Protein backbone atom coordinates (compact mmCIF):
# COMPACT_ATOMS: atom_id res chain seq x y z
CA UNK A 1 0.00 0.00 0.00
CA UNK A 2 1.03 3.63 -0.28
CA UNK A 3 2.59 5.22 2.76
CA UNK A 4 4.03 3.85 5.97
CA UNK A 5 1.23 2.20 7.95
CA UNK A 6 2.04 2.98 11.59
CA UNK A 7 0.15 0.17 13.35
CA UNK A 8 1.58 -3.34 12.98
CA UNK A 9 -1.95 -4.75 12.82
CA UNK A 10 -5.52 -3.61 13.10
CA UNK A 11 -9.12 -3.91 11.99
CA UNK A 12 -11.21 -1.67 9.77
CA UNK A 13 -14.92 -2.05 10.47
CA UNK A 14 -16.75 0.28 8.09
CA UNK A 15 -19.81 -0.38 5.90
CA UNK A 16 -19.34 -0.28 2.13
CA UNK A 17 -21.86 0.75 -0.50
CA UNK A 18 -22.04 2.36 -3.93
CA UNK A 19 -20.20 5.66 -4.28
CA UNK A 20 -22.82 8.45 -4.34
CA UNK A 21 -21.46 10.03 -7.55
CA UNK A 22 -19.15 7.60 -9.35
CA UNK A 23 -21.09 4.39 -10.01
CA UNK A 24 -17.88 2.48 -10.86
CA UNK A 25 -16.62 2.98 -7.32
CA UNK A 26 -17.59 1.76 -3.91
CA UNK A 27 -17.21 3.90 -0.77
CA UNK A 28 -17.59 3.91 2.98
CA UNK A 29 -21.33 4.45 3.39
CA UNK A 30 -22.56 4.63 6.98
CA UNK A 31 -26.21 5.09 5.96
CA UNK A 32 -26.77 2.57 3.16
CA UNK A 33 -23.63 0.43 3.15
CA UNK A 34 -23.39 -3.25 4.02
CA UNK A 35 -21.19 -4.39 6.93
CA UNK A 36 -17.55 -4.88 5.97
CA UNK A 37 -14.67 -5.94 8.22
CA UNK A 38 -11.02 -6.15 7.16
CA UNK A 39 -8.19 -7.29 9.45
CA UNK A 40 -4.70 -6.25 8.43
CA UNK A 41 -1.11 -7.00 9.39
CA UNK A 42 2.10 -5.31 8.27
CA UNK A 43 4.56 -7.78 6.73
CA UNK A 44 7.31 -5.32 5.77
CA UNK A 45 7.84 -1.57 5.54
CA UNK A 46 9.65 0.01 2.58
CA UNK A 47 9.67 3.69 3.61
CA UNK A 48 7.02 5.13 1.27
CA UNK A 49 5.25 1.78 0.88
CA UNK A 50 4.02 -1.01 3.17
CA UNK A 51 3.61 -4.70 2.28
CA UNK A 52 0.55 -6.06 4.08
CA UNK A 53 -1.57 -9.13 4.66
CA UNK A 54 -5.37 -8.93 4.86
CA UNK A 55 -8.01 -11.25 6.24
CA UNK A 56 -11.63 -10.53 5.37
CA UNK A 57 -14.66 -11.31 7.50
CA UNK A 58 -16.90 -10.13 4.67
CA UNK A 59 -16.48 -10.07 0.91
CA UNK A 60 -17.71 -6.72 -0.35
CA UNK A 61 -16.83 -5.46 -3.81
CA UNK A 62 -13.46 -3.64 -3.68
CA UNK A 63 -13.40 -4.13 0.11
CA UNK A 64 -9.63 -4.00 0.65
CA UNK A 65 -9.22 -1.17 -1.84
CA UNK A 66 -11.97 0.94 -0.23
CA UNK A 67 -10.96 0.25 3.37
CA UNK A 68 -7.28 1.02 2.81
CA UNK A 69 -8.02 4.18 0.82
CA UNK A 70 -10.36 5.28 3.63
CA UNK A 71 -7.48 5.29 6.13
CA UNK A 72 -5.12 7.08 3.74
CA UNK A 73 -3.20 4.05 2.46
CA UNK A 74 -4.56 3.11 -0.99
CA UNK A 75 -3.13 0.19 -2.92
CA UNK A 76 -0.01 0.97 -4.89
CA UNK A 77 -0.97 1.83 -8.47
CA UNK A 78 -4.75 1.64 -7.86
CA UNK A 79 -5.98 4.11 -10.46
CA UNK A 80 -9.59 3.99 -9.27
CA UNK A 81 -9.06 4.70 -5.57
CA UNK A 82 -5.68 6.45 -5.53
CA UNK A 83 -4.86 9.54 -7.51
CA UNK A 84 -2.00 10.56 -5.19
CA UNK A 85 0.08 7.39 -5.31
CA UNK A 86 0.73 6.60 -8.97
CA UNK A 87 3.04 3.76 -9.86
CA UNK A 88 3.70 3.21 -13.53
CA UNK A 89 4.47 0.02 -15.40
CA UNK A 90 2.63 -2.46 -13.18
CA UNK A 91 1.47 -5.57 -15.02
CA UNK A 92 -1.41 -6.11 -12.61
CA UNK A 93 -2.82 -4.99 -9.30
CA UNK A 94 -0.76 -5.02 -6.14
CA UNK A 95 -3.36 -7.29 -4.62
CA UNK A 96 -3.10 -11.08 -4.58
CA UNK A 97 -5.26 -13.76 -2.95
CA UNK A 98 -2.60 -16.10 -1.54
CA UNK A 99 -5.21 -18.35 0.04
CA UNK A 100 -8.95 -18.47 -0.46
CA UNK A 101 -11.38 -20.82 1.23
CA UNK A 102 -15.11 -21.43 1.12
CA UNK A 103 -17.78 -24.02 1.80
CA UNK A 104 -18.80 -25.78 -1.40
CA UNK A 105 -22.48 -24.99 -2.08
CA UNK A 106 -23.42 -28.57 -2.97
CA UNK A 107 -21.14 -30.84 -0.95
CA UNK A 108 -20.91 -28.47 2.07
CA UNK A 109 -17.23 -29.42 2.23
CA UNK A 110 -14.72 -26.70 3.15
CA UNK A 111 -12.32 -26.11 0.27
CA UNK A 112 -9.13 -24.07 0.31
CA UNK A 113 -6.82 -23.04 -2.51
CA UNK A 114 -3.43 -21.31 -2.45
CA UNK A 115 -1.31 -19.65 -5.13
CA UNK A 116 2.16 -18.09 -5.10
CA UNK A 117 2.71 -14.41 -5.86
CA UNK A 118 2.76 -13.63 -9.57
CA UNK A 119 6.26 -12.92 -10.91
CA UNK A 120 5.53 -9.20 -11.53
CA UNK A 121 4.46 -8.80 -7.88
CA UNK A 122 7.50 -10.62 -6.53
CA UNK A 123 9.76 -8.56 -8.82
CA UNK A 124 8.17 -5.35 -7.50
CA UNK A 125 8.85 -6.39 -3.90
CA UNK A 126 12.49 -7.04 -4.78
CA UNK A 127 12.80 -3.53 -6.29
CA UNK A 128 11.27 -1.78 -3.27
Annotated model-derived regions:
Residues 1-128:
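RNA pseudouridine synthases
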Amino acid sequence: VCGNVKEDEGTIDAPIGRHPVDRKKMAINEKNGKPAVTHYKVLKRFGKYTYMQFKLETGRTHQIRVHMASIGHPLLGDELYSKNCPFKHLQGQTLHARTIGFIHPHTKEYMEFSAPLPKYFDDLLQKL
